[in-house]
Amino acid sequence: MKSRLFLIAVLSLLCGSFVSAQAQNSDEYDVFLLIGQSNMAGRGYMIEGEEDVFDENVFLLNDAGEVVPATNPLNQYSSIRKGMSIQRIGPGLGFSKKISKKTGRKILLVVNARGGTTLAQWAKGESGDGYYEEAVRRTKQAMQYGTLKAIIWHQGCGDSK
């Protein structure tokens, strides 16, 4: 229960941090922040030939703050990720396909996940690792292109004990 309340508090702080940035954005993209642990970073394998089957309306925010067509691994531009060799497929692929089909709008994904972290490490100013601050910074970059529609968190097993 404590972990859930903590997560709600962290996400509330994230949402509040974006209010001022929304007034100055474009409306070209629906922005989605995908953060969390290894499950969000992507550790799954895809069937050969289906690795990069994205809708033409799905994009990523790259490490230079620019919009590029989405390709896997989605966590490739994360400012906090572990090595590229372990970045694979996460829930962002299926999510982006569904949301793009449902809305018909351009989707901009900000994927900034890191495996092996705990909820406490994502708290604002708590860990010194800067995961919260990086999520806020990258989302503000993306909001020059569109409006933040949702923050999607996927827990790994960092707090399972």
Regions found by a protein language model. Name each.
Residues 19-22:
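Sec/Tat signal peptide C-region and signal peptidase I cleavage site
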Residues 8-17:
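Bacterial N-terminal signal peptides
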